[in-house]
């Protein structure tokens, strides 16, 4: 690869130095992957998965043994009592919406304790967007968010003060998303849950688990979360699931959410799986390994770009809890050029040049470099971000470590050619 780059010799030398630095961390990632894959394998064996479970269902989808067993496996692996895993859940945002509308009722309040959530959730809660769009606000469900401290930690005093008799759901966003703060480790989420449950044990703790599955050995429900949600075109789909989302948690809350997902009186009993089951099963089995490849790529990205003077978050040697690696460019042109170079190093649509543009759910123009086999799949290598200071690109995913390495080296070579670094 390096002999095709303009600055190949320099980049090869730098890459070799980087891989020597990160070898120990890569070993740790592989060990976590092996333990997570063992847990998945044990669950498949426990549930006696066979090729019968891949049989498509049509129409109403009643008595779909493949779908029902997969939901039991998700619950088993992720530490919940029950789960919903459906191709009809179109995204992580949709899964989160089902969770919130499933358990909140008029007069209740949702309190996010990890700061303002993703931009896409602002229209769900009703702080942005038109009236009568069906937001929580339209149903007289309150919303509040507690800002983090200056160093990105939970402000526990402010959380205690914000909890009131109307508070029913505590929202926790595991990944930083587009925010300039650290993502939260499972150990930190465990402490958050302990804290709010001591105030009121009846509070429902919901965790947005997007980008976090299989990064650590435990998931939020293992440490006391009542409900969590995510997307199948992120970590748990293993790069094979073409669409879908999931919810896992306490059985009574999953049942409540199932009525929001379909209809009261129907719940989880219907919903045809069509031809999605085989790829969902195989993708979930591969997910721990694929996530490890993405993580190894993220560590390489951080160390490589830090050596070139860029600011990365998390740092290359920091403990990780999600796939997202942010890189601060402090310059609009550099950020756009980097994302474009990632697109050019992709297997799909490498001939396409992405430009910043409006995207539904986001306040600023966003650039999205995603030459992926599955549209919008964050488990595949992508680079994106809102065009606003300090011009941070969010790099995530990678089905293979070698693709991430090749793409980052190629992107840096492109920036060098343009004399941007």
From Swiss-Prot:
SUPFAM superfamilies, alphabetized: PLP-dependent transferases
One Pfam family per UniProt: Met_gamma_lyase
Name by which UniProt lists this protein: Uncharacterized protein YnbB
């Amino acid at each position: 690869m390096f002999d095709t780059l303009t600055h190949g010799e320099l980049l090869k030398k730098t890459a070799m130095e980087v891989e020597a630095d990160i070898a120990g961390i890569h070993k740790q990632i592989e060990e976590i992957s092996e333990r997570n894959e063992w847990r998945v394998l044990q669950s498949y064996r426990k549930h006696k998965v066979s090729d019968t479970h891949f049989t498509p269902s049509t129409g109403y989808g009643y008595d779909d043994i493949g779908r029902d067993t997969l939901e039991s496996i998700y619950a088993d692996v992720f530490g919940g009592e029950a789960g919903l895993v459906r191709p009809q859940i179109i995204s992580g945002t949709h899964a989160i919406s089902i969770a919130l509308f499933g358990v909140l009722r008029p007069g209740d309040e949702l309190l996010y304790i990890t700061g303002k959530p993703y931009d896409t959730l602002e229209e769900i809660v009703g702080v942005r967007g038109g009236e009568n769009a069906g937001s929580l606000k339209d149903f007289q469900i309150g919303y509040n968010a507690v800002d983090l401290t200056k160093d990105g930690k939970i402000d526990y005093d402010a959380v205690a003060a914000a909890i009131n008799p109307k508070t029913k759901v505590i929202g926790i966003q595991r990944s930083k998303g587009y925010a300039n703060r650290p993502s939260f480790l499972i150990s930190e989420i465990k402490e958050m849950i302990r804290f709010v449950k001591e105030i009121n044990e009846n509070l429902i703790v919901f965790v947005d688990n997007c980008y976090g599955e299989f990064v650590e050995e435990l998931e939020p429900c293992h440490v006391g979360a009542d409900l969590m949600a995510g997307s199948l075109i992120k970590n748990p789909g293993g790069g094979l699931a073409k669409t879908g989302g999931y919810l896992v948690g306490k059985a009574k809350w999953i049942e409540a959410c199932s009525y929001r997902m379909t209809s009261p009186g129907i719940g989880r009993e219907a919903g045809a799986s069509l031809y999605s089951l085989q790829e969902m099963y195989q993708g979930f089995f591969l997910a721990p390994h694929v996530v490890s490849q993405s993580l190894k790529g993220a560590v390489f990205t951080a160390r490589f770009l830090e050596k070139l003077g860029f600011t990365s978050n998390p740092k290359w040697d920091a403990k990780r809890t999600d796939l997202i690696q942010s890189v601060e460019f402090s310059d609009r042109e550099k950020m756009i050029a980097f994302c474009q170079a990632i697109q050019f190093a992709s297997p799909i649509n490498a001939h396409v040049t992405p430009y910043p543009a409006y995207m539904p759910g986001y306040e600023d123009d966003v650039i999205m470099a995603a030459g992926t086999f599955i549209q919008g799949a964050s488990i595949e290598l992508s680079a994106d971000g809102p065009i606003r200071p300090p011009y941070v690109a969010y790099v995530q995913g990678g089905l293979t470590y070698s693709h991430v390495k090749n793409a980052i080296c190629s992107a840096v070579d492109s920036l060098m050619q343009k004399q941007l670094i």
